[in-house]
Amino acid sequence: MNELKNKLIGEGKENNILDYNEFLFLYRIGIPCQSRHILWDCLIDNPCGITNDIFNYYSQQIKEFDFNMQKADILEKINHNKPSGEDEEDELSNKIIIDMIKSEDLFINELYILQKSTSEILSKIYKLIYIFFLMRRDIPYNKNIINYAFVFILVFNDEYTSFKNLYNFICSSNIIKYLIKDNNYIEKNIDLFNRLMKKYTPKCYNHFNNLDISSELFSVFWFENLFTQTLNYKIILRIFDLFLIYGDELLFQIGLAIIKIEEEDLINYPINEIFKILRRLPNKYDEELFFENLDLINIHDYYNNYISKTNLSDQLDFLCSESLVTY
């Protein structure tokens, strides 16, 4: 991916698609919709070697699918306590459809705003997810992939290109560590976010500490679905733009930006209201305000220092260099 970034972004235009200043400007104002699929395709690349032939091979294993018909069938089975499936493939199919039904209202709202066909998009999402888990039987089913599939279908529309980028995005980034429940990785991220809250949002850190609220209760939720269940999709698409460049560091920066924006309410509201705020922010969340706050939070040096030292044998020295952060 780094080689592609270098080709995409350089000091000048001679051998690059964009020069560095143009690139920063695009990312600051948001990549135009008509350019997003080109940039994502370049940045994600295809390290897993997903070809059209591979996609077609697995596509042929899927029965003709219409989301609305399958939804009606599943709901009837649930209402009448009928068996949901007889084999592994049926069980996978039913899990996907049930989780898509639970997310349908969110998708419909976004698709209405974007003037997209709901039934067609949802059928494509199902196909992408089903093929992904057919190919990666080593990964336990995880409903968060529905949100990722929705994002990639919105950007690419074409089924093969959407799947190729979705598969490579998940399997060649740390996102997969949330899908497989890598506890060491997740616990390290929780610890880092606690430390960052203490440093950058001390009022909320102290308030949460007094209420015995652990950041684990919301940060893991944010990170494992890349904020797709928390923010509206205009913001989400721009977050994915940035994530493809900055990677995991951006997740912590976004989390701090949300807490900073909502700080006044978070330190004055009771626990149940705090979780409502942190789980699902209003659809009319101001896009420009969000990215202005994001720009103000610079964690780059602290983040790199933490990651480098926790990856080396002197991890203990780093942990002892600050007072232990606990909730």
Predicted regions and their residues:
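C-terminal regulatory/linker segments that are acidic, Ser/Thr- and Pro-rich
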Residues: 22, 256-327
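Internal, helix-rich recognition cores of eukaryotic regulatory domains
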Residues: 1-285
